[in-house]
From Swiss-Prot:
GO terms for biological process: positive regulation of gene expression; regulation of transcription by RNA polymerase II. This is Mediator of RNA polymerase II transcription subunit 23. The keyword Isomerase does not apply. It holds the Pfam family Med23. Signal peptide: none annotated. The gene is MED23. Residues 1348-1372, 1411-1439 have a biased composition (Low complexity). PANTHER family: MEDIATOR OF RNA POLYMERASE II TRANSCRIPTION SUBUNIT 23 (PTHR12691:SF10). Keywords: Activator, Coiled coil, Nucleus, Transcription, Transcription regulation. One of its GO terms (molecular function) is transcription coregulator activity. Belongs to the Mediator complex subunit 23 family.
């Protein structure tokens, strides 16, 4: 059968001998050749039909080879005949196109076959599915690359043939495949042949609009707030960079703006500059600790930061330093930069993310081109940090490049002067010689002969050190008040011959065992931060190792507790992140368990105190780990002592309340992957579990996620309810996020019957009075089955007798500390029930409070902090709740004991413990004046544990936090007045709060709904807490000057002008840019890890504290950019927009929802409803365009602010976009411009939403189709101006984000759209052309005219094919038909372009000038027709 096809071809190509002989005189009939060609085509169809299906590809290949060898006329006939095979369904159009393009003879040198091949493809490609068209287009694109750049004019027709088929495919009106696919393919292999470059680039340029709709305005200028918490993956999606290129990771190939495709070096450098940023850097770049991979981009930025620090140092004089135990060293910003860089360098080199050797080489290369000398010692100091700690474990070859830095940085021919040994700057100046000594020692150990001489500049330094380590000098050395011993430790930390003696002296000084020259005992000395900063990392590690070793020995021997100076110094050492493995990690994993194992209760108590009151910026996972450890330790019988148990609970309370809102959910869910949910919840303490739930509620509210309950959270809550069943009052549930509210509403425990409780207490009291035998009394009340009502009974005894009998003492001693908590809960319930039901009123409640105060202060039965915490967390409704709060007020304020202690403690003490050397002396004197007892009789069985860092005031502080919150929840005026009284007397205690601004932020955020209508209470809260620091902080440390004036005024109302909001945003923007707007502080001991974080939280506190409605505050913040655009320096505009986004995203929903209100206003502007601008929508929505061309800016500026807000939002807040789009913005949309504006709003965040909330993207996509249908119907018969851009965006969503998830929903809507939209979107639903045409005729006959005017060539071909039977076609008719179709296609394109002006790739300002655009299009069409006619004439002459 295969030979039949070839025979048919040969028969057609055979030339009769007579014809050949008389060719010059024979006259042929007019239609002979056409009839012959028709017969051949029919015979070919018959012959091919007889070929087996599996052999047709091979036969077709042979046919094409035979055709390629024919003459010009015969090639045309042979190729044209192949169309018949496709029309007759003998072969598929896809197979034909593939075989033609793969034909070995297809070469542009073979002109006729090349041209006819591409003409053939053009004729049949309309019958190829879009995937096949995509592959054909790629092959055609690649074939064009065969032509040389300096192509000969004789090859131009062949190149034009390729261009013609590509133009045909690219023509959107033909709808052969989604234009999105075309752009995706042609963007990758640039550049193209110059003849096609215009075609390709013009098509790609059309997708600038799609790229604009999915690009964040000012993305490259956005900067984050770097907090120290453990980052969850979804919190970093906004800031992720490719770790090799430092570029943003965009989905899809689109022509984004150049700045979005550049390396984001400023972003990484900014983050690296921030203290406590290493975790964010690791998440940004997706650094994997276990892979030990070197990241060149990170390495380069570290080098740049070091060079920048040297430049900063060059512009400033060298620091003089501070004395040995200076309490408050003034460190300049650039010196902080060096301290921070040292920590960063060690971390990234330690985990092998960067190479130390390559960093040194890069530094040498950069510094060799610069004249920087002032910072050379600082550079050597940070190199010394790493060298001293790692040189013993690494070969000397890794450090040899450092010698090149010596040659470069120390070229002096005279020795440098020795620095002042009494100043801390001395250790920096001596760092070069310390580095030299470490390197030379390592070389000797490895037997490497380094002949390099000592730099002359360092000769004096070397001689001085050599003198210090002589035997005589070492033996007579004492610590003194200079830095010589520190220097020896730094220089010889790897040389045990010289290192042991100075390290021993440091330990002796801390332990108080040092001797003066005359033999006297020297008191223990706490090392200042200045001294610790002067030690290298290796020396710090050795020191902390010595501390831990000593404490472990003391724990094993149950000996004395370490000296206070040593513990204070140990706590200060734990703040250094570069020694984390030996520091906080060793503290939790080694020291604490060993101390507990050896039952060294005094040391355990002291270590927990130290953790509570001395440690800062402890990573969250360590705090969760300690919380779990505390719960496991507290369940051991040996720890069931009053003072130790109180310390456990107090430490756990501080741990729980200190967990940040953004930290709680990711850290706990991660922790529960390995541990049971009960690991961080208490099995016995209802109060701790209640605070844990309140902290979870706050986290859900502030950070988001309160609308749905995650799996780990349900397990966590059910575990709590199982071990400590409890209920919540309605006023607390009202503040809970919806998910928590629903959970506790369903799982609420029934309240205890108060009458039964009172009856049980009366029975116990009768039992007490009726029994006379002491042993019987003790046995009865210590029996496990007895109700835990002894504190209730004791209350009645003291009420009656004002004394406690010895029997009661013995019973209390028999009740364990944890069991006493159960008694306390019953007592609190009983107390409230008694007062609430009493008819005696004021006298009764006062006597009750006096009795409780006696129990607390006189008889030491319970402590004030435990009683108040328990009372505050009990579940009471209505009148009982008010009674409970009244009791709390009287407990705190009626008696003077607590108030006196608070006033005395706050007057004589300063919370900046790291600046003090005499904290212990002051604290000891306070305890002597106000001694604390933790038992009725501190006998031998209850030996008091030493107290170094805590007291009743500090323990009460987290309880006061809880009390304030509980008072706010009960929205009754007199309750809030009581809170005001409490703050008046006790707010001074907030001076010692380690997170006062964070506490204010959380309070104002969580209770925003309640406080919104209570400006006086907000003012009271902010004023009371911030004023507590008035004596120890500079005036500008927190709130702004105008707000401070408001706090000091009597009026509770104030409506600030726009300039006020502008100043707040300027302050934040300046801080982020690096200006020192606030006070200088040591961020290692601060509430916040860096200045921008501090600036954000104080700004939010101030805005939340304003007596202004949230929508008005939000509107003013947006107007800072919209109305203040003209007065903001243009170089700073993006930093201001970034700052507004940061602030709004950090405020509660009533504030950040204001951006949706403003977007709604934009959609409803008259010009959106009736576009009258002469600029098209994409121009006016482009921030860069309106800024540079000075056009109407409102739309673009509001978009920029919205993008900034959404970019800084967390995942849960961003996911609310679907709801706001549906409820607030969708009802406004009627026009194309509104639809495009809406696409600009959510388009840039689809990628993030897909990562964080995958199902949400599908919901947004369905909304978009619904809005498109509304717009389509609203426009009626009028053509859509932006149809192609909208379709491109829909294809982007389908192929990048949703796939076929919404296929059914989208298909139903697309079928209801106008035919032109259906045509363009048919690849989303796979609609047939017949369905599109037929459905629309049935649907709306009025659209027939539009359909006929805008019908595409593909539709025309499809409709004409049935009208002309293939058996009657002649060759001439085919040519005429083809020409007619081309002319019709040109006319249709011209008509369609007139009807719907394309906005893609049009000049600025052309959007409104339709007449001018039509003239341009007509001229372009005339030129195209002329070129096609010229090409046709050339082809005819050639043939």
């Amino acid at each position: 059968m295969e030979t039949q096809v070839i025979d048919t071809v040969n028969e057609f190509l055979k030339v009769d001998s007579l014809d050949e002989a008389f060719v010059s005189v024979i006259v042929f009939k007019p239609n002979t050749e056409q009839e012959r060609a028709t017969r051949f085509a029919n015979d070919l169809v018959t012959a091919f039909g007889n070929v087996a299906q599996e052999n047709r590809e091979q036969v077709l290949r042979l046919y094409l080879l035979r055709a390629a060898g024919a003459s010009g006329y015969h090639i045309k006939v042979l190729m044209a005949a192949l169309v018949k095979l496709v029309d007759a369904h003998v072969i598929t159009a896809r197979m034909l196109c593939d075989k033609v393009l793969m034909c070995e003879k297809l070469d542009f040198e073979h002109r006729t076959f090349w041209i006819e091949s591409f003409r053939l493809i053009k004729r049949v490609i309309v019958q190829v599915d879009y995937k096949g068209v995509r592959e054909i287009m790629k092959v055609c694109r690649d074939k064009a690359q065969w032509f040389p750049l300096n192509v000969n004019v004789t090859y131009m027709p062949q190149l034009l043939a390729v261009e013609d088929i590509l133009r045909f495919i690219f023509d959107r009106n033909n709808c052969l495949l989604p234009a999105y696919f075309i752009a995706n393919e042609i963007m990758r292999p640039f550049p193209y042949h110059w003849k096609l470059n215009r075609l390709m680039t013009d098509f790609v340029e059309e997708f600038r609009t799609t790229a604009q709709m999915v690009s964040i305005i000012g993305h490259a200028s956005m900067l984050p707030i770097v907090e120290h918490f453990g980052y969850a993956d979804h919190m970093m999606n906004s800031w992720r960079l490719d770790h090799n290129t430092l570029k943003f990771n965009f989905k899809g190939s689109l022509p984004y703006e150049p700045e979005l495709l550049e390396e984001q070096k400023p972003l990484l450098r900014y983050v690296l500059e921030q203290p406590y940023s290493r975790e964010m850097v690791s998440q940004m770049l997706n650094l994997q600790k276990h892979q030990k991979q070197r990241y060149n981009a990170l390495e380069e930025q570290l080098v740049n930061l070091i060079v920048q620090a040297m430049e900063m140092t060059e512009a400033n004089d060298a620091t003089a330093g501070s004395g040995f135990n200076s309490s408050d060293e003034q460190i300049t910003p650039y010196e902080w930069m060096w301290l921070h860089l040292s920590s960063q360098l060690i971390y990234f080199v330690l985990f092998q993310f960067v190479s130390f050797m390559h960093i040194v080489l890069a530094l040498h290369e950069k510094l060799s081109k610069l004249e920087l000398r002032k910072g050379r010692d600082q550079l050597m100091w940070i190199l010394l940090q790493f060298i001293s700690g790692s040189i013993q474990k690494n070969p000397i070859t890794n450090f040899l490049p450092v010698f090149r830095l010596f040659d470069l940085l120390y070229p002096e021919l005279e020795p440098l002067k020795l620095p002042d040994i009494n100043k801390s700057s001395m250790v920096r100046h001596m760092a070069p010689i310390c580095v030299w000594i470490h390197l030379m020692k390592k070389a000797r150990v490895e037997n490497m002969n380094i002949t390099r001489p000592l730099p002359i500049a360092l000769k004096n330094h070397y001689d001085f050190l050599q003198h210090l380590v002589t035997a005589n000098t070492m033996m007579n050395m004492t610590l003194g008040n200079d830095f010589r011993i520190i220097l020896i430790c730094n220089a010889y930390s790897t040389n045990q011959e010289y290192f042991g003696r100075p390290m021993g002296l440091l330990l002796d000084a801390l332990n108080g065992t040092s001797k003066s020259p005359n033999g006297g005992q020297i008191p223990a000395v706490t090392f200042s931060v200045t001294v610790l900063d002067s030690l290298t990392v290796h020396s710090k590690m050795s020191l902390i190792h010595s501390f831990v070793t000593q404490m472990l020995k003391q724990a094993q021997s149950k000996g004395q507790v370490p000296a206070a100076a040593l513990l204070e110094t140990y706590a200060r050492l734990l703040v250094y992140t570069e020694i984390e493995s030996l520091g906080i990690k060793g503290f939790l994993s080694q020291l604490m368990p060993t101390v507990f194992k050896n039952h060294a209760w005094a040391m355990l108590h002291t270590l927990m105190e130290m953790f509570s009151y001395r440690l800062h910026h402890v990573p969250t996972h360590y705090r969760v780990q300690l919380l779990s450890l505390l719960h496991s330790l507290s369940s051991v019988p040996q720890t069931n002592k009053m003072q130790l148990n109180l310390c456990f609970e107090s430490t756990a309370l501080r741990l729980i309340t200190s967990i940040g809102s953004a930290e709680f959910q990711p850290q706990f869910s991660r922790y529960f992957n390995d541990k049971s949910p009960g690991a961080v919840a208490s099995n016995e303490s209802e109060e701790l579990n209640r605070v844990l739930i309140l902290t979870l509620a706050r986290s859900m509210h502030v950070h988001g996620g309160g609308d749905e309950m995650q799996g780990w959270c349900k397990d966590f809550l059910s575990n709590i309810i199982q071990h400590t069943p409890h209920s919540w009052p309605m006023h607390s549930l009202a503040c809970f996020p919806p998910a928590l509210n629903e959970y506790f509403t369903q799982n609420n425990q029934p309240p205890e019957n108060k009458q039964q409780l009172k009856k049980a207490v009366e029975e116990e009291y009768r039992t007490w009075t009726s029994m006379t035998n002491e042993n019987d009394i003790i046995a009865h009340f210590l029996r496990p089955t007895t109700n835990p009502l002894f504190l209730c009974l004791l209350f009645k005894i003291i009420w009656e007798t004002e004394n406690i009998s010895p029997v009661a003492y013995k019973i209390l001693e028999g009740i364990s500390a944890r069991a006493l908590s159960t008694h306390l809960r019953k007592f609190c319930d009983y107390l409230v029930a008694e007062v609430a039901s009493s008819s005696d009123g004021r006298d009764f409640i006062h006597k009750c409070v006096d009795t409780i105060n006696n129990m607390i202060w006189k008889f030491n039965v319970v402590t004030i902090d435990r009683v108040v915490l328990c009372l505050a967390l009990r579940t009471h409704e209505g009148n009982e709740a008010q009674v409970c709060f009244l009791i709390i007020q009287l407990l705190l304020l009626k008696a003077s004991e607590l108030r006196n202690r608070v006033q005395e403690f706050c007057k004589d003490n300063n919370p900046d413990h790291w600046k003090q050397s005499n904290w212990q002396d002051k604290h000891l004197s306070f305890h002597q004046k106000y001694p604390e007892k933790f038992a009725l009789d501190e006998s031998a069985s209850q030996i008091p544990l030493p107290v170094y860092f805590s007291n009743v005031c500090l323990r009460f502080l987290p309880v006061l936090d809880v009390v304030v919150h509980r008072f706010i929840e009960l929205t009754i005026t007199n309750v809030h007045q009581i809170l005001g009284f409490i703050l008046d007397h006790l707010s001074i205690l907030y001076k010692f709060h380690d997170r006062p601004i964070t506490y204010l932020y959380n309070t104002l955020h969580y209770y925003e709904r309640i406080l919104r209508d209570r400006p006086a209470l907000k003012k009271k809260l902010v004023g009371a807490i911030t004023s507590a620091f008035s004596e120890i902080r500079p005036p500008n440390w927190s709130v702004s000057e105008p707000y401070k004036v408001y706090l000091q005024s009597q009026d509770s109302l104030w409506t600030p002008e726009l300039s006020y909001y502008m100043s707040l945003i300027r302050r934040l923007a300046d801080t982020i840019s690096g200006k020192n707007v606030f006070y200088s502080t040591d961020w290692r001991f601060n509430e916040f890890p860096n200045a921008p974080t501090h600036a954000l939280y104080v700004t939010c506190v101030e805005l939340l504290g304003l007596p202004v409605a949230p929508p008005l505050v939000a509107s003013n913040l947006i107007d800072v950019i919209v109305s203040g655009y003209a007065v903001i320096p243009q170089k700073d505009i993006h930093s201001y927009i970034n700052a507004v986004g940061i602030v709004l995203a950090a405020l509660p929903e009533p504030y950040w929802s204001g951006i949706y209100d403003r977007l709604q206003d934009m959609l409803n502007t008259p010009n959106m409803l009736n576009w009258t601008y002469r600029f098209n929508a994409f121009e006016l929505f482009n921030f860069k365009t309106v800024r540079e061309a000075m056009l109407e800016k409102t739309y673009a500026v509001v978009l920029a602010v919205a993008h900034s807000v959404f970019h800084h939002m967390g995942a849960f807040k961003l996911a609310a976009m679907t709801r706001y789009l549906k409820e607030k913005l969708k009802p406004c949309v009627r026009t194309e411009q509104q639809l495009l504006y809406l696409c600009h709003v959510f388009g840039p965040f689809l990628q993030r939403i897909e990562l964080e909330k995958p199902n949400a993207v599908a919901g947004i996509a369905v909304l978009l189709y619904e809005i498109l249908e509304i717009v389509d119907k609203h426009h009626g018969p009028k053509p859509l101006q932006y149809m192609d851009q909208i379709c491109d965006f829909l294809y982007h969503i389908k192929y990048i984000h949703v796939g076929n998830i919404i296929k059914n929903e989208s298909e139903a809507i697309i079928k209801r759209l106008r035919p032109l939209l259906q045509m363009r979107l048919r690849f989303i639903t796979h609609l047939n052309l017949e369905d599109i045409h037929t459905e629309k005729i049935n649907d709306n006959t009025s659209n027939n005219a539009i359909t006929s005017q805008t019908q595409s060539p593909m539709q025309t071909q499809h409709q004409q094919q049935p009208q002309q039977p293939h058996q009657q076609q002649q060759q001439q008719q085919q040519q005429q038909q083809q020409q007619q179709q081309q002319q019709q296609q040109q006319q249709q394109m011209q008509q369609q372009q007139i009807n719907a002006v394309q906005t893609t790739s049009v000049p600025l300002g052309s959007g409104g000038n339709l007449q001018q655009q039509q003239q341009i299009n007509q001229q372009q069409q005339m030129y195209m027709q002329h070129m096609q006619q010229h090409q046709h004439m050339q082809n005819m002459r050639h043939n």
